[in-house]
């Protein structure tokens, strides 16, 4: 019985991806452990933030690595309403975060992926909107 429960938990975990934030991506890249994140997801915003910070001659190569390793989640019309609602609420409270981080958080909320970030405190204010923060 215990073995079945463990197997079920493992399968459930494997089915649910994690949205990796730029801060975690940079950390793993610097440690040359990027492949350990393979199979997870990144926002197109994360890809842009990361690639703009590396030398131009490496950008195409890194983008191809990202395409191989990750599900790249694009921004589409599904994000418009949730982004706008959360933005208004945060603005009203004087708790705005920059648009790029809000896009990343809304992507995680819409896809129901926990967000793995090193900036947990920064994203905490979005938990009430359904953001789950992954804690390794």
Swiss-Prot record:
Cofactor(s) needed: Mg(2+)
Pfam families: PIN
Family: Belongs to the PINc/VapC protein family.
Record protein name field: Ribonuclease VapC1
Native source species: Methanocaldococcus jannaschii (strain ATCC 43067 / DSM 2661 / JAL-1 / JCM 10045 / NBRC 100440) (Methanococcus jannaschii)
Positions that bind Mg(2+): 21, 101
Taxonomic superkingdom: Archaea
Entries under InterPro entries matching the protein: PIN-like_dom_sf, PIN_dom, PINc/VapC_TA_RNase, VapC_family
Enzyme class: hydrolase
Ranges where the PINc domain occurs: 18-129
GO molecular function, one term: RNA nuclease activity
The protein's role, per its UniProt record: Toxic component of a type II toxin-antitoxin (TA) system. An RNase. Its cognate antitoxin is VapB1.
Keywords, sorted A to Z: Hydrolase, Magnesium, Metal-binding, Nuclease, Toxin-antitoxin system
Gene designation per UniProt: vapC1
Entry EC number(s): 3.1.-.-
């Amino acid at each position: 019985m215990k073995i079945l429960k463990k197997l079920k938990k493992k399968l459930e975990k494997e089915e649910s991806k994690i949205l990796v934030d730029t801060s975690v991506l940079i950390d793993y890249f610097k440690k040359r452990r990027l492949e350990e994140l393979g199979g997870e997801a990144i926002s197109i915003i994360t890809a842009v933030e990361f690639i703009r910070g590396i030398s131009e001659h490496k950008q195409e190569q890194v983008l191809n690595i990202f395409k191989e390793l990750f599900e790249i989640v694009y921004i589409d019309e599904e994000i418009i309403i949730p982004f706008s609602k959360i933005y208004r609420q945060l603005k009203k409270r004087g708790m705005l975060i920059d648009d790029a981080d809000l896009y990343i958080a809304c992507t995680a909320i819409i896809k129901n992926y926990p967000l793995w970030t090193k900036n947990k405190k920064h994203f905490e204010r979005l938990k009430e909107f359904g953001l789950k923060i992954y804690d390794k």
